[in-house]
């Protein structure tokens, strides 16, 4: 009998000067970037949290703490690949990932196809098992004021 689990992840980072904006493993031209210990890829962090949560392994901070210099500036695609490996070691497979980027600016639509391809590649799944979309908050809240960017992700994992 096939066992299935669902995971949910959420992440948010503040926008700051003098940082590159990396979302979904894609560098997006913008005057500010996300602050963080790693590359601050809010989308990949939310996906990592969803996958880790589905397996019952806590969250990204437990596995890749911001107090560990080894993760300073690290490409979050590396973190996602490591999470995927942890699933594989426990005989779990990714059924699908559905994620939403929450940002007033910049526009994400031109970059979503590349983000989706990176995520599918890093997880070792077909591209149709990954969905990435973006929305604004109609200028409401921290994202609407351009203070930061958030992302949410849900995943289904299966084994057996």
From Swiss-Prot:
Cofactor: a divalent metal cation
Residue numbers binding 4-CDP-2-C-methyl-D-erythritol 2-phosphate: 11-13, 37-38, 59-61, 64-68, 103-109, 135-138, 142, 145
Catalytic activity, EC: 4.6.1.12
Source domain of life: Bacteria
Sequence positions that bind a divalent metal cation: 11, 13, 45
Function of the molecule: Involved in the biosynthesis of isopentenyl diphosphate (IPP) and dimethylallyl diphosphate (DMAPP), two major building blocks of isoprenoid compounds. Catalyzes the conversion of 4-diphosphocytidyl-2-C-methyl-D-erythritol 2-phosphate (CDP-ME2P) to 2-C-methyl-D-erythritol 2,4-cyclodiphosphate (ME-CPP) with a corresponding release of cytidine 5-monophosphate (CMP).
Subunit structure: Homotrimer.
PANTHER family xref list: 2-C-METHYL-D-ERYTHRITOL 2,4-CYCLODIPHOSPHATE SYNTHASE, CHLOROPLASTIC
Descriptive protein name: 2-C-methyl-D-erythritol 2,4-cyclodiphosphate synthase
Native species: Thiobacillus denitrificans (strain ATCC 25259 / T1)
């Amino acid at each position: 009998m096939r066992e299935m689990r669902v995971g949910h992840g959420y992440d948010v980072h503040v926008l700051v000067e003098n940082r590159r904006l990396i979302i979904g493993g894609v560098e997006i031209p913008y005057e500010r970037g996300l602050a963080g210990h790693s590359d601050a890829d809010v989308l990949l962090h939310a996906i990592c949290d969803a996958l880790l949560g589905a397996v019952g392994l806590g969250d990204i901070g437990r596995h890749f703490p911001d107090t560990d210099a080894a993760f300073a500036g690290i490409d979050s695609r590396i973190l996602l690949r490591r999470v995927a490996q942890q699933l594989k070691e426990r005989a779990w497979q990714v059924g699908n990932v559905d994620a939403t980027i929450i940002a007033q600016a910049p526009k994400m639509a031109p970059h979503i196809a590349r983000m989706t391809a990176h995520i599918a590649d890093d997880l070792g799944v077909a591209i149709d098992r990954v969905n990435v979309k973006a929305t604004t908050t109609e200028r409401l809240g921290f994202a609407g004021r351009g203070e930061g960017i958030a992302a949410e992700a849900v995943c289904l994992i299966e084994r057996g």
